[in-house]
Amino acid sequence: PTDTLEIDLAARYESTLGQSSVEPKISALWTPAEGVFIRASAGSSFRLASENQSFGIGPSGTTIREIGGEVTQARALAVGNSNLLPEESDSWTVGVTWDVTDSLTLDLSYWEYEFTNLVTVVSPDDILLADQADGFITDPRIELFPGANNEICEITGRWDGVNLNTRPGDCMTGFDIALFKSGFINQNTVETNGVDFQVSYDFPFMGGDAGIRVNGAYVNRYAGTATDGSIIDVVGTDGSNVAGVGTNPQLRGNIIATYNRDNHSFRWTTRFTDGTELRNPRA
């Protein structure tokens, strides 16, 4: 039928470990003409931190930035945080599907998500950056080897930071760091929006059925609040050590070709991922 409107309302109640939430959702589907479908939805959700994030201890190693002319590795512990708040999100989407012919279908969707209280681990690099501004390491989350000095002389000015032969012997180097004690925190907010698209074409070919699909996603914005309070848009960058998220290419896509005949089938997939800049998005 055409010129029809369907509306669905739903809600989910969840109670775990003394925390509860009611998450509503509304969705609508409008068919203004034959082969044309317009849809929209809005809702919210929440997720508790995992057992490891709340109570676990995860050992790892990390490569730290140059200190005293030395780039080195140090041990790191990510300690659980029992006071983590649940992650929450609000989202809405709107899209249209058009069956142009029996063979050709076009699909376009716009989506927008806002996440709050996202759980992420504080990176050792962020701990070090926040603590070294005055040239001395005093953060209790950074443990030095016994007898090591906590002065970074290239910051305090006792060394030019270039010629290793002139570096005072009591100046701190990267090898003096024994351990980072990082932990999980609720990152403030992440906002993201973008577009998904797909073109599908099916046709008979050599006694069988062939099809071509072109689909992809374009991320317009992926911005989050870092541990220092700054707003970072990491789209198109490798910002995993800054915003607590992975690499974020702006465009991803697939071209899929299929062919089916009797008991035989063929599928070919070509994937495209946009390049990313290996840079600090805060720079």
What are these regions (language model features)?
Residues P1-L29, E34-E87, S89, Y110-C171, S265, T269-R271:
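Surface-exposed extracellular loop regions of Gram-negative outer-membrane beta-barrel proteins
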Residues T4-I7, G35-I38, D102-L106, G207-A210, ...:
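Repeated loop/turn-to-beta-strand initiation elements of outer-membrane beta-barrel proteins
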Residues L48-S109, Y113-F115, F180-V195, S200-F205, ...:
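Outer-membrane beta-barrel signature, preferentially recognizing the C-terminal barrel domain
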